[in-house]
Amino acid sequence: MIEEHDAAINALDFKSDIPFVFDKICSEKNIYVLHPYNFGWAGFLTVVDPDGKPLESLSDKPLGFELKVAEYVLGYQAFWMQPQEWLDKVVKQYQREEGANPPPQLSVASWITAGLCTQALFNIATGKEVKRFPKFYFSSLLQ
């Protein structure tokens, strides 16, 4: 089904290893994989190059993977002196909650993330440069 495609979008929930399996199959078929995330007030996208580092390098366990991605973003942004204090507060609050609630998402970040995906897909299709994991796209309405 994914034969002869240049890119795929992996927006699967990390409730099992299926997203990792999907990435592996795409890598074997030389397909870029876009991983979009809705962080409420921000959109995040990373593109996994078929020959590059897998997203699974953040954690090989699917449970809580979205949180690992958010923590990675926080660490990366802090390293480059662009801390996202609001996201840090959201992550800490989420970690304190009990139960298996999904991460908080807002429609505004869905639109932001869709734009990031559209631009990345355009760049892949036209042979332009695209940030590849471990680099990423991050666009926030909050500072």
Language-model features and meaning:
Residues 40-43, 114-115, 127:
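Glycine-centered flexibility sites
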Residues 123-143:
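Phosphate-binding loop/pocket of nucleotide- and phosphate-handling active sites
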Residues 6-108, 142:
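E1/E1-like adenylate-forming module used to activate ubiquitin-like modifiers
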Residues 2-3:
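A short, aliphatic-rich alpha-helical micro-motif
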Residues 105-125:
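Mid-domain beta-loop-alpha active-site segment that forms a flexible
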